[in-house]
């Protein structure tokens, strides 16, 4: 008799679970996430994927492509969403791929993302360098010369990223072309060289952003300092943005927010997923902490999945709340 009760109870649980699965809005629908080739973006992308799975969606592994390709893929419906839409940094790419006519973007996923130019603190203090405009002086520029041509060598970013257009625009706007050579290439490889130079006690000049592990290795304020710019100057869709802060400081880039962007037609047919995209929030500090773990060697696919598990376990109530609110939007 006891076995019969256990079996009946297990069967009832199974039936309830199956019925619940059948009621889930994502049943039978496959989702294709997309991100850039920056592996540190996987954590926040997978967090969204996990929440979608709780809504019943089948979620593929994220595709890694250049941002431009990512936006056009989402606009055409070849991909479903990205969790790394930087605003306003990606505004030109977003607009070029169709803007609000093609994309669904509601809510703010991550707040307070900063970016800009930095130099090592030792050189900054030795030569009293606080502003990138000081690099117009050939004597100052030569301090950062790494290849013997007399110009400062600035580490830029990977071709096709939003920062590439801004850096090139500002190099011209601030009249630095004669004294500063910007290198754009594989960001991770260039950064490895920059960190090696820094550890050797040599001057460094580079672009970076937060959240990212670089600022955990070369800490702003302790090891390196942010450089200000002479005035606000941004290209394209960002051209009217004043980057000056309330305290008068100007680091050349506005503080960015990150958003989950999805194909608009898909979002309209999937209100539960659309609601989820609008309400999910991830603290910048949590991304920094996870990125630092990756840089310390915990960067395999299994490691990153483990980091996602850990975050959800530590924020289970919040995570379940997102899923519950998203499910309610379907009704």
UniProtKB/Swiss-Prot annotation:
InterPro entries, sorted: ABC_Gly_betaine_transp_sub-bd
Disulphide bridges, residue numbers: 157-163
Subunit and interaction comment: The complex is composed of two ATP-binding proteins (ProV), two transmembrane proteins (ProW) and a solute-binding protein (ProX).
Subcellular localization: Periplasm
UniProt name for this protein: Glycine betaine/proline betaine-binding periplasmic protein
Biological source species: Salmonella typhimurium (strain LT2 / SGSC1412 / ATCC 700720)
Induction: Induced in response to increased extracellular osmolarity, this is the third gene of the proU operon (proV-proW-proX). Osmoregulation requires curved DNA downstream of the transcription start site in proV, which is repressed when bound by H-NS. H-NS may act indirectly to influence the local topology of the promoter.
A biological process from GO: amino acid transport
Keyword Signal: yes
Domain of life: Bacteria
GO CC terms in record: ATP-binding cassette (ABC) transporter complex; periplasmic space
Coiled coil: none
Entry-linked NCBIfam families: PRK11119.1 (NF008334)
Signal peptide: 1-21
GO MF assignments: transmembrane transporter activity
Any Pfam family hit: OpuAC
Physiological role: Part of the ProU ABC transporter complex involved in glycine betaine and proline betaine uptake. Binds glycine betaine and proline betaine with high affinity.
Keyword entries, A-Z: Amino-acid transport, Disulfide bond, Periplasm, Signal, Transport
Residues reported to bind substrate: 86, 90, 161-163
């Amino acid at each position: 008799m006891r076995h019969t009760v256990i079996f009946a109870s297990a069967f009832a649980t199974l039936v309830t679970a199956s019925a619940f699965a059948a009621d889930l809005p994502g049943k039978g629908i496959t989702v294709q996430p997309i991100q850039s080739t920056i592996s540190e973006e996987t954590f926040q992308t997978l967090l969204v994927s996990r929440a979608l799975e709780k809504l019943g969606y089948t979620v593929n592994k994220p595709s890694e492509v250049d941002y431009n390709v990512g936006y056009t893929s989402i606009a055409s419906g070849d991909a479903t969403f990205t969790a790394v839409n930087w605003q306003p940094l990606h505004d030109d790419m977003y607009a070029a791929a169709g803007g609000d006519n093609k994309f669904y973007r509601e809510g703010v996923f991550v707040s307070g993302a900063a970016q800009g130019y930095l130099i090592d603190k030792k050189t900054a203090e030795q030569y009293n360098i606080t502003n990138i405009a000081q690099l117009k002086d050939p004597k100052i520029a030569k301090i950062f010369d790494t290849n013997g041509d007399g110009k400062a060598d600035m580490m830029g970013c990977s071709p096709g990223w939003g920062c590439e257009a801004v850096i090139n625009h500002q190099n011209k706007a601030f009249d630095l072309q004669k004294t500063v050579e910007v290198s754009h290439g594989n960001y991770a490889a260039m950064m490895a060289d920059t960190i090696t130079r820094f550890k050797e006690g040599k001057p460094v000049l580079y672009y970076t952003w937060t959240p990212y592990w670089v600022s955990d290795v070369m800490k702003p304020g302790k090891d390196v300092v942010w450089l200000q710019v002479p005035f606000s100057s941004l290209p394209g869709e960002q051209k009217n943005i004043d980057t000056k802060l309330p305290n008068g400081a100007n680091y050349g880039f506005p503080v960015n927010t990150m958003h989950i962007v999805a194909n608009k037609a898909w979002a309209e047919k999937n209100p539960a997923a659309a609601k989820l995209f609008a309400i999910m929030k991830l603290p910048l500090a949590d991304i920094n902490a996870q990125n630092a773990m990756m840089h310390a060697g915990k960067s395999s696919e299994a490691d990153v999945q483990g980091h996602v598990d850990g975050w959800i376990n530590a924020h289970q109530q919040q995570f379940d709340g997102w899923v519950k609110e998203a499910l309610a939007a379907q009704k």
